[in-house]
Amino acid sequence: MTVPKSSYFTTASYFSGTLFEIRHAVTKHFNLEENNHNLQLENMRLRSQVPSYLYEIGRDSIIHVDSNYHQQYQYIPATIINSTITKRNNFFTLNAGRIHGIRKGLGVFSSNGVVGIIHACSEHFSLVKSVLTSDINIDVMIEGNGAFGLLKWDGKNPNNGQISGITNDIKIPINSNVVTRGGSGIFPRGLTVGKVTKVTPVEGKSVWRIEIQFSEKYAVLENTYIIKNLFLNEMTALQTKNEGY
């Protein structure tokens, strides 16, 4: 039996087209990874120029912005390569370590919100204690009225957190934005944390129990930034020296 030449042509065209589709998909995947990395670098560059993340020197001068500010924060992009969200204390593993200038105690955030604090480092990797842990205690505040407290997580829903320490004489509107306060120096002031969803009084105490919805979906998070406060040692040394006053 003789197979028509047209059949050979059709079969060859099919396999050729399939190979091109596979090659295109693979190329697209790697291009997407490269584009994501480039976007991270661009976001990092832009954040480093935001005036609220800089330390103002010439506060009464408006002659030249660059001479009036010193960069206070540096940002190092990193990708999550392993994570947990269902345990009582959850961690993220990042593909950046000591060779990138990472050390214990640095803050980690994403384009959507706060992620956690570096807990341990090796040469090439870092372990992040995420906001989904029992003792995270990040200082946060309510936008609009400036009320501040500590971010907590009760171990139940990875999408929701709690704020403690705000007295119930302060009105806390539902849907208020929650942001970092910046008091510890780990995070700059004003990074997104989430929104207030519920406010209830704590029985026998003069404080609120405040429920928030996190702005970041930690179950699908991949790209992060590690933040380094260039003035942190100066700030903590001053505070430690004057603790008794």
Description of each model-found segment:
Residues 1-99, 103-245:
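Extracytoplasmic/periplasmic terminal helices and flexible tails
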